[in-house]
């Protein structure tokens, strides 16, 4: 059954437009508080946020809702999403909340929820929350006046996260002699990432580390590598790291300024962990968007690749089911379950840097683990995502899939967070893949206005 408020990564929308309004955010706080409060627990919620302007508004609204439901709110301030997941466990909270729209522009915002185990909530839990959200607010059982919650700002939380990230490396691993440019996307990692790298011994040049509420993900971070590439060239850095607005994804560039996507980063970590006996069950989990070249590379090494729907929560679910400890997406969500319950851009980057130090290879050599199969991906903004269900569109999709056969892949899907349909064709013939994608985009555009 389609969900009303939750997408693939929480509740998301434009700030001050439903559902990202203060009144609805307060109701979310009440509903989640009612569902998770228990007399057997501390009735505690941790709330983090990124650096967009509307976070102040939504944070206060959520605090009002949670405290009205009888929960104490621990406010973390601007902090990466994986830090919220970690601190949810560390502070023994009943629920964790991250206010962020990830890689989106400042005018969007969202609410991500984590359970007491640090994992994102299940579909079943989100369905229960939606049922409460659809009820009248006067029907929700608020706390009595003696049990109203309190709000408290947590001191030093960012330094706890930095230590946690550093501890994912062996104590003898240092990053001395590495010149690293880190692009913080003017987002939640602007303090933690440069500091962690510096404490590990690297020479750090931080860019896009001055958030002002509006510039998060603005021509920077993992969605736009231009400024990172330019700075790497300018300072002759060994490597560049691009994080997104909430720090749960990472892309990198080598010393030549060439992009290293999530698939290549996963390949580096998986190969190293396999050689050192750390890879569980000889396999990894990715999504349907990961390149066929990665699958071929792993197969040659006797490793399995399991694909899921797009969304790191689905990757994590499959990892838990199969007991795998590496998973991720080509977009840069990389989940290393030995350390993390969700994607962590800083931790993933540290593992790659450790491989770089051990191999003594330049980044351009280390991260060329496989030759990507040509993959043409285009996005089409639509008014109605149900355009994919129209008979002529369905027929065209079937025909294109049959044409590709076993020599390629076709993926057409509606985004879970944006009014966009993504069309991807993958195969060894780039020209043919481009033609297939262009034809389908044209067809979708025509029927979107029918």
From Swiss-Prot:
Domain of life: Bacteria
Protein's organism: Bartonella bacilliformis (strain ATCC 35685 / KC583 / Herrer 020/F12,63)
GO molecular function: magnesium ion binding; phosphoglucosamine mutase activity; phosphomannomutase activity
Cited InterPro entries: A-D-PHexomutase_a/b/a-I, A-D-PHexomutase_a/b/a-I/II/III, A-D-PHexomutase_a/b/a-II, A-D-PHexomutase_a/b/a-III, A-D-PHexomutase_C, A-D-PHexomutase_C_sf, Alpha-D-phosphohexomutase_SF, GlmM_bact
Family (UniProt): Belongs to the phosphohexose mutase family.
Disulfides per UniProt: none
Co-factor note (free text): Binds 1 Mg(2+) ion per subunit.
Cofactor(s) the protein needs: Mg(2+)
One BP annotation, GO: UDP-N-acetylglucosamine biosynthetic process
Residues found modified as Phosphoserine: 102
Role summary: Catalyzes the conversion of glucosamine-6-phosphate to glucosamine-1-phosphate.
Enzymatic reactions: alpha-D-glucosamine 1-phosphate = D-glucosamine 6-phosphate
Signal peptide: none
Record PTM text: Activated by phosphorylation.
GO CC annotation terms, alphabetical: cytosol
Record bears the keyword Isomerase: yes
Residues that coordinate or bind Mg(2+): 102, 244, 246, 248
Protein name: Phosphoglucosamine mutase
Keywords: Isomerase, Magnesium, Metal-binding, Phosphoprotein
Enzyme Commission number: 5.4.2.10
Active-site positions on this chain: 102
Species lineage: Bacteria, Pseudomonadati, Pseudomonadota, Alphaproteobacteria, Hyphomicrobiales
């Amino acid at each position: 059954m389609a969900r009303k408020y939750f997408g693939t990564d929480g509740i998301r929308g434009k700030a001050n437009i439903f559902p990202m309004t203060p009144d609805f955010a307060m109701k979310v706080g009440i509903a989640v508080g009612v569902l998770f409060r228990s007399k057997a627990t501390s009735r505690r919620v941790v709330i983090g946020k990124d650096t967009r302007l509307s976070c102040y508004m939504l944070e206060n609204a959520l605090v009002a809702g949670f405290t009205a439901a009888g929960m104490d709110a621990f406010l973390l301030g601007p902090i990466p999403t994986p830090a919220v997941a970690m601190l949810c466990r560390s502070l023994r909270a009943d629920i964790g909340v991250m206010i962020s729209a990830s890689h989106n522009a400042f005018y969007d915002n969202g609410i991500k929820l984590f359970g007491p185990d640090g994992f994102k909530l299940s579909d079943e839990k989100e369905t229960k929350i939606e049922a409460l959200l659809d009820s009248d607010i006067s029907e929700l059982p608020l706390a009595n006046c003696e049990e109203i919650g309190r709000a408290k700002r947590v001191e030093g939380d960012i330094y706890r996260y930095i230590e946690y990230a550093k501890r994912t490396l062996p104590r003898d691993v240092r990053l001395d002699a590495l010149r690293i440019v880190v692009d913080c996307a003017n987002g939640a990692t602007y303090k933690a990432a440069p500091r962690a790298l510096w404490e590990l011994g690297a020479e750090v040049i931080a860019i896009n580390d001055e958030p002002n509420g509006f510039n998060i993900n603005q021509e920077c971070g993992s969605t736009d590598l231009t400024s990172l590439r330019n700075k790497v060239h300018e300072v002759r850095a060994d490597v560049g790291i691009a994080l997104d607005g909430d720090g749960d994804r990472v892309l990198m560039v080598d010393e030549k300024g060439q992009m290293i996507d999530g698939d290549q980063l996963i390949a580096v970590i998986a190969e190293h962990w396999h050689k050192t006996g750390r890879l569980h069950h000889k396999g990894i989990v990715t999504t349907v968007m990961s390149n066929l070249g990665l699958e071929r590379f792993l197969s040659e090494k006797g490793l399995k690749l399991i694909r899921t729907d797009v969304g790191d929560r689905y990757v994590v679910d499959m990892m838990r089911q199969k007991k795998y400890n590496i998973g991720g997406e080509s977009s840069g969500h990389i989940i290393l379950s030995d350390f993390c319950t969700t994607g962590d851009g800083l931790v993933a980057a540290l593992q790659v840097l450790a491989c770089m130090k051990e191999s003594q290879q330049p980044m351009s050599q280390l991260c060329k683990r496989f030759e990507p199969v040509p993959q043409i991906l285009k996005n089409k903004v639509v008014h109605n995502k149900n355009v994919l269900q129209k008979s002529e569109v369905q027929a065209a999709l079937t025909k294109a899939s049959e044409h590709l056969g076993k020599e390629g892949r076709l993926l057409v899907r509606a985004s879970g967070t944006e009014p966009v349909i993504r069309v991807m064709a993958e195969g060894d013939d780039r020209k043919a893949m481009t033609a297939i994608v262009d034809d389908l985009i044209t067809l979708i555009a025509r029927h979107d206005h029918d």
